[in-house]
Amino acid sequence: MIDKLKTETRNQATMALDSMPIHDILKAMNREDGKVPTAIATQLPQIEKAVKLVIASFQQGGRLIYAGAGTSGRLGVLDAVECKPTFGVSPEMVRGVIAGGEQAFTEAVEGAEDDERAGANDCNRLNIGEKDTVIALAASGRTPYAIGVLKEAEARGANTVSIACNKEAKMSQYASVAIEVETGPEVLTGSTRLKAGTAQKLILNMISTTAMVGIGKVYQNLMVDVQPTNQKLVERAKRIIMEATDSTYETAADYYQKANGHVKAAIVMILLDCSYDEALTKLQNAKGFIRKTVDK
Protein backbone atom coordinates (compact mmCIF):
# COMPACT_ATOMS: atom_id res chain seq x y z
CA MET A 1 0.00 0.00 0.00
CA ILE A 2 1.17 3.51 -0.81
CA ASP A 3 0.70 4.70 2.78
CA LYS A 4 3.40 2.26 3.87
CA LEU A 5 6.03 3.91 1.67
CA LYS A 6 8.43 6.17 3.55
CA THR A 7 8.29 8.70 0.73
CA GLU A 8 4.58 9.07 1.47
CA THR A 9 4.74 9.37 5.26
CA ARG A 10 4.65 12.69 7.10
CA ASN A 11 7.88 14.40 8.13
CA GLN A 12 7.62 15.03 11.86
CA ALA A 13 10.03 17.98 11.64
CA THR A 14 7.72 19.93 9.33
CA MET A 15 4.26 19.24 10.74
CA ALA A 16 3.78 23.01 11.20
CA LEU A 17 5.11 23.90 7.74
CA ASP A 18 2.17 26.20 7.02
CA SER A 19 2.95 28.39 10.03
CA MET A 20 6.75 28.35 9.93
CA PRO A 21 8.66 31.55 9.07
CA ILE A 22 10.28 31.57 5.63
CA HIS A 23 13.76 31.26 7.11
CA ASP A 24 12.78 28.18 9.11
CA ILE A 25 11.21 26.54 6.05
CA LEU A 26 14.40 27.10 4.09
CA LYS A 27 16.51 25.70 6.93
CA ALA A 28 14.28 22.64 7.14
CA MET A 29 14.50 22.02 3.40
CA ASN A 30 18.24 22.50 3.40
CA ARG A 31 18.60 20.11 6.34
CA GLU A 32 16.51 17.45 4.64
CA ASP A 33 18.33 17.86 1.33
CA GLY A 34 21.60 17.28 3.18
CA LYS A 35 20.47 13.74 3.98
CA VAL A 36 20.36 12.76 0.33
CA PRO A 37 24.10 12.26 -0.38
CA THR A 38 24.41 10.08 2.73
CA ALA A 39 21.53 7.91 1.53
CA ILE A 40 23.12 7.62 -1.91
CA ALA A 41 26.46 6.60 -0.39
CA THR A 42 24.89 3.35 0.82
CA GLN A 43 24.06 2.47 -2.78
CA LEU A 44 27.43 3.19 -4.42
CA PRO A 45 28.17 -0.54 -4.99
CA GLN A 46 24.88 -0.90 -6.89
CA ILE A 47 25.47 2.32 -8.81
CA GLU A 48 28.90 0.99 -9.80
CA LYS A 49 27.29 -2.16 -11.19
CA ALA A 50 24.91 -0.01 -13.21
CA VAL A 51 27.76 2.08 -14.61
CA LYS A 52 29.60 -1.05 -15.73
CA LEU A 53 26.51 -2.23 -17.59
CA VAL A 54 26.21 1.13 -19.35
CA ILE A 55 29.88 1.14 -20.35
CA ALA A 56 29.54 -2.39 -21.74
CA SER A 57 26.51 -1.29 -23.75
CA PHE A 58 28.34 1.70 -25.19
CA GLN A 59 31.35 -0.44 -26.11
CA GLN A 60 29.07 -2.76 -28.09
CA GLY A 61 27.35 0.10 -29.89
CA GLY A 62 24.32 -0.08 -27.62
CA ARG A 63 22.34 2.66 -25.92
CA LEU A 64 21.42 3.97 -22.50
CA ILE A 65 17.66 4.43 -22.13
CA TYR A 66 16.07 6.20 -19.17
CA ALA A 67 12.36 5.68 -18.52
CA GLY A 68 9.96 6.95 -15.90
CA ALA A 69 6.73 8.78 -15.17
CA GLY A 70 6.27 12.35 -13.96
CA THR A 71 9.30 13.86 -12.24
CA SER A 72 11.24 10.61 -12.62
CA GLY A 73 10.70 10.61 -16.37
CA ARG A 74 11.55 14.29 -16.71
CA LEU A 75 14.83 13.81 -14.86
CA GLY A 76 15.78 11.00 -17.23
CA VAL A 77 15.03 13.18 -20.26
CA LEU A 78 17.02 16.04 -18.72
CA ASP A 79 20.13 13.92 -18.22
CA ALA A 80 19.81 12.37 -21.66
CA VAL A 81 19.58 15.64 -23.59
CA GLU A 82 22.64 17.04 -21.80
CA CYS A 83 24.84 14.17 -22.96
CA LYS A 84 24.96 15.30 -26.59
CA PRO A 85 26.50 18.76 -26.04
CA THR A 86 28.61 17.67 -23.06
CA PHE A 87 30.11 14.48 -24.47
CA GLY A 88 29.58 14.77 -28.21
CA VAL A 89 27.41 11.67 -28.49
CA SER A 90 24.47 11.22 -30.82
CA PRO A 91 21.00 11.87 -29.36
CA GLU A 92 20.23 8.20 -30.06
CA MET A 93 22.99 6.96 -27.76
CA VAL A 94 21.35 8.26 -24.59
CA ARG A 95 17.56 8.53 -24.68
CA GLY A 96 14.95 9.52 -22.15
CA VAL A 97 11.32 8.43 -22.39
CA ILE A 98 8.45 9.58 -20.20
CA ALA A 99 5.06 8.01 -19.57
CA GLY A 100 2.48 9.83 -21.66
CA GLY A 101 4.94 10.92 -24.34
CA GLU A 102 6.65 14.24 -24.96
CA GLN A 103 3.67 16.33 -23.86
CA ALA A 104 4.07 14.84 -20.36
CA PHE A 105 7.32 16.74 -19.97
CA THR A 106 5.46 20.02 -19.49
CA GLU A 107 2.05 18.89 -18.28
CA ALA A 108 0.62 15.95 -16.39
CA VAL A 109 -0.96 13.21 -18.51
CA GLU A 110 -3.73 11.61 -16.48
CA GLY A 111 -3.27 7.91 -15.83
CA ALA A 112 -0.03 7.61 -17.82
CA GLU A 113 2.01 6.22 -14.94
CA ASP A 114 -0.58 3.52 -14.24
CA ASP A 115 -0.31 1.96 -17.70
CA GLU A 116 2.12 -0.96 -17.51
CA ARG A 117 1.45 -1.87 -21.13
CA ALA A 118 2.54 1.61 -22.22
CA GLY A 119 5.96 0.93 -20.71
CA ALA A 120 6.27 -2.23 -22.77
CA ASN A 121 5.06 -0.39 -25.87
CA ASP A 122 7.76 2.27 -25.44
CA CYS A 123 10.39 -0.48 -25.31
CA ASN A 124 9.00 -1.92 -28.52
CA ARG A 125 8.88 1.50 -30.17
CA LEU A 126 12.54 2.08 -29.34
CA ASN A 127 13.41 -1.44 -30.50
CA ILE A 128 15.25 -2.17 -27.26
CA GLY A 129 17.79 -4.95 -27.73
CA GLU A 130 20.43 -6.98 -25.95
CA LYS A 131 23.12 -4.33 -26.45
CA ASP A 132 21.11 -1.70 -24.56
CA THR A 133 20.91 -0.78 -20.89
CA VAL A 134 17.50 0.39 -19.68
CA ILE A 135 17.22 2.35 -16.43
CA ALA A 136 13.72 2.74 -15.03
CA LEU A 137 13.08 5.34 -12.34
CA ALA A 138 10.22 5.58 -9.84
CA ALA A 139 10.41 7.28 -6.46
CA SER A 140 7.77 4.94 -5.06
CA GLY A 141 9.40 1.90 -6.60
CA ARG A 142 6.02 0.56 -7.69
CA THR A 143 4.93 2.63 -10.72
CA PRO A 144 3.26 0.30 -13.28
CA TYR A 145 4.71 2.15 -16.29
CA ALA A 146 8.28 1.69 -14.98
CA ILE A 147 7.62 -1.96 -14.18
CA GLY A 148 6.27 -2.47 -17.69
CA VAL A 149 9.47 -0.99 -19.10
CA LEU A 150 11.65 -3.31 -17.02
CA LYS A 151 9.67 -6.44 -17.85
CA GLU A 152 9.74 -5.81 -21.59
CA ALA A 153 13.38 -4.70 -21.61
CA GLU A 154 14.39 -7.88 -19.80
CA ALA A 155 12.34 -9.99 -22.21
CA ARG A 156 14.16 -8.35 -25.10
CA GLY A 157 17.56 -9.19 -23.58
CA ALA A 158 18.60 -5.72 -22.42
CA ASN A 159 20.46 -4.91 -19.22
CA THR A 160 17.97 -3.57 -16.69
CA VAL A 161 18.47 -1.17 -13.77
CA SER A 162 15.87 0.20 -11.37
CA ILE A 163 16.17 3.36 -9.26
CA ALA A 164 13.69 3.65 -6.39
CA CYS A 165 13.58 5.84 -3.30
CA ASN A 166 12.09 3.22 -0.99
CA LYS A 167 13.49 -0.06 0.29
CA GLU A 168 12.07 -3.40 -0.87
CA ALA A 169 10.69 -1.69 -3.95
CA LYS A 170 8.39 -3.79 -6.12
CA MET A 171 10.25 -2.80 -9.29
CA SER A 172 13.56 -4.11 -7.92
CA GLN A 173 12.54 -7.71 -8.64
CA TYR A 174 12.39 -6.92 -12.35
CA ALA A 175 15.89 -5.39 -12.61
CA SER A 176 19.28 -7.06 -12.88
CA VAL A 177 20.66 -4.17 -10.79
CA ALA A 178 18.39 -2.57 -8.20
CA ILE A 179 19.28 0.80 -6.66
CA GLU A 180 17.18 1.62 -3.60
CA VAL A 181 17.94 5.00 -2.03
CA GLU A 182 15.79 5.55 1.03
CA THR A 183 15.24 9.30 1.04
CA GLY A 184 12.49 9.22 3.67
CA PRO A 185 9.57 11.59 4.29
CA GLU A 186 9.50 14.80 2.29
CA VAL A 187 9.24 18.29 3.79
CA LEU A 188 5.96 18.54 1.89
CA THR A 189 4.27 15.18 2.37
CA GLY A 190 4.40 13.00 -0.72
CA SER A 191 6.07 15.63 -2.92
CA THR A 192 8.76 13.35 -4.31
CA ARG A 193 10.02 16.04 -6.68
CA LEU A 194 11.98 17.17 -3.58
CA LYS A 195 14.45 14.78 -1.88
CA ALA A 196 13.55 11.78 -4.03
CA GLY A 197 13.95 13.82 -7.21
CA THR A 198 17.24 15.24 -5.96
CA ALA A 199 18.52 11.73 -5.26
CA GLN A 200 17.51 10.52 -8.70
CA LYS A 201 19.23 13.44 -10.41
CA LEU A 202 22.45 12.91 -8.46
CA ILE A 203 22.46 9.22 -9.35
CA LEU A 204 21.87 9.92 -13.04
CA ASN A 205 24.72 12.45 -12.93
CA MET A 206 26.95 9.72 -11.54
CA ILE A 207 25.92 7.08 -14.04
CA SER A 208 26.15 9.14 -17.23
CA THR A 209 29.33 11.01 -16.28
CA THR A 210 31.22 7.94 -15.07
CA ALA A 211 30.13 5.91 -18.08
CA MET A 212 31.37 8.63 -20.41
CA VAL A 213 34.72 8.63 -18.60
CA GLY A 214 34.77 4.90 -19.22
CA ILE A 215 34.54 5.29 -23.00
CA GLY A 216 37.14 8.03 -23.38
CA LYS A 217 34.96 11.13 -23.43
CA VAL A 218 37.07 12.76 -20.70
CA TYR A 219 40.78 13.62 -20.43
CA GLN A 220 42.01 14.50 -16.95
CA ASN A 221 38.77 16.10 -15.74
CA LEU A 222 38.07 17.94 -18.99
CA MET A 223 35.08 17.29 -21.28
CA VAL A 224 37.16 16.93 -24.41
CA ASP A 225 34.29 15.82 -26.64
CA VAL A 226 32.26 18.95 -25.96
CA GLN A 227 30.32 20.12 -29.01
CA PRO A 228 31.03 23.84 -29.59
CA THR A 229 27.56 24.74 -30.82
CA ASN A 230 27.61 28.36 -29.62
CA GLN A 231 30.18 31.05 -28.89
CA LYS A 232 30.34 30.23 -25.20
CA LEU A 233 31.16 26.61 -25.99
CA VAL A 234 33.71 27.62 -28.63
CA GLU A 235 35.55 29.58 -25.95
CA ARG A 236 35.21 26.70 -23.53
CA ALA A 237 36.67 24.35 -26.14
CA LYS A 238 39.70 26.60 -26.60
CA ARG A 239 40.23 26.79 -22.85
CA ILE A 240 39.99 23.02 -22.57
CA ILE A 241 42.78 22.78 -25.14
CA MET A 242 44.80 25.31 -23.11
CA GLU A 243 44.33 23.38 -19.87
CA ALA A 244 45.06 19.97 -21.39
CA THR A 245 48.26 21.09 -23.09
CA ASP A 246 49.43 23.90 -20.78
CA SER A 247 49.56 26.19 -23.80
CA THR A 248 48.64 29.83 -24.36
CA TYR A 249 45.22 30.96 -25.48
CA GLU A 250 46.68 31.96 -28.84
CA THR A 251 48.18 28.51 -29.39
CA ALA A 252 44.97 26.81 -28.36
CA ALA A 253 42.90 29.01 -30.68
CA ASP A 254 45.30 28.31 -33.55
CA TYR A 255 45.11 24.54 -33.12
CA TYR A 256 41.37 24.70 -32.62
CA GLN A 257 41.18 26.09 -36.16
CA LYS A 258 43.74 23.61 -37.53
CA ALA A 259 41.72 20.75 -36.04
CA ASN A 260 38.45 22.05 -37.50
CA GLY A 261 37.00 22.47 -34.03
CA HIS A 262 37.88 18.90 -33.00
CA VAL A 263 39.07 19.40 -29.42
CA LYS A 264 40.58 15.96 -28.96
CA ALA A 265 42.55 16.19 -32.18
CA ALA A 266 43.85 19.64 -31.28
CA ILE A 267 45.10 18.36 -27.93
CA VAL A 268 46.87 15.39 -29.51
CA MET A 269 48.36 17.60 -32.23
CA ILE A 270 49.94 19.85 -29.61
CA LEU A 271 51.08 17.13 -27.20
CA LEU A 272 52.53 14.84 -29.90
CA ASP A 273 53.49 17.53 -32.41
CA CYS A 274 51.65 15.79 -35.22
CA SER A 275 49.27 16.66 -38.04
CA TYR A 276 45.49 16.64 -37.86
CA ASP A 277 45.21 13.42 -39.86
CA GLU A 278 47.85 11.75 -37.72
CA ALA A 279 46.03 12.83 -34.56
CA LEU A 280 42.77 11.35 -35.81
CA THR A 281 44.48 8.04 -36.65
CA LYS A 282 46.16 7.86 -33.26
CA LEU A 283 42.88 8.58 -31.49
CA GLN A 284 41.09 5.96 -33.52
CA ASN A 285 43.74 3.38 -32.63
CA ALA A 286 43.30 4.26 -28.95
CA LYS A 287 39.49 4.06 -29.22
CA GLY A 288 39.16 7.76 -28.53
CA PHE A 289 41.12 7.85 -25.28
CA ILE A 290 43.53 10.80 -25.22
CA ARG A 291 45.52 9.41 -22.30
CA LYS A 292 46.14 6.12 -24.09
CA THR A 293 47.09 8.08 -27.21
CA VAL A 294 49.65 10.38 -25.62
CA ASP A 295 51.08 7.88 -23.12
CA LYS A 296 52.19 5.41 -25.80
Swiss-Prot record:
In its UniProt record, which GO terms are filed under biological process? amino sugar catabolic process; N-acetylmuramic acid catabolic process; peptidoglycan turnover
Q: Where is the SIS domain?
A: 54-217
Task: Supply the EC number(s).
Answer: 4.2.1.126
The cross-references to Gene3D superfamilies, in alphabetical order and at most eight, read: 1.10.8.1080, Glucose-6-phosphate isomerase like protein, domain 1
Q: In which pathway does it act?
A: Amino-sugar metabolism; N-acetylmuramate degradation
User: What reactions does this protein catalyze?
Assistant: N-acetyl-D-muramate 6-phosphate + H2O = N-acetyl-D-glucosamine 6-phosphate + (R)-lactate
Q: Where would one find coiled-coil regions in this protein?
A: none
Cited Pfam families: GKRP_SIS_N
Give the active-site positions: E82 (proton donor), E113
Keywords assigned: Carbohydrate metabolism, Lyase
Q: Which domain of life is it from?
A: Bacteria
Q: Which InterPro entries match?
A: Etherase_MurQ, Glucokinase_regulatory_CS, MURQ/GCKR, SIS_dom, SIS_dom_sf
> What SUPFAM superfamilies does UniProt report for this protein, alphabetically?
SIS domain
- One MF term in the entry's GO annotations: carbohydrate derivative binding
Assembly state and interactors?
Homodimer.
What role does it play? Specifically catalyzes the cleavage of the D-lactyl ether substituent of MurNAc 6-phosphate, producing GlcNAc 6-phosphate and D-lactate.
A further note on this protein reads:
A lyase-type mechanism (elimination/hydration) is suggested for the cleavage of the lactyl ether bond of MurNAc 6-phosphate, with the formation of an alpha,beta-unsaturated aldehyde intermediate with (E)-stereochemistry, followed by the syn addition of water to give product.
Q: Could you say which protein family the record assigns here? A: Belongs to the GCKR-like family. MurNAc-6-P etherase subfamily.
The protein here is known as N-acetylmuramic acid 6-phosphate etherase
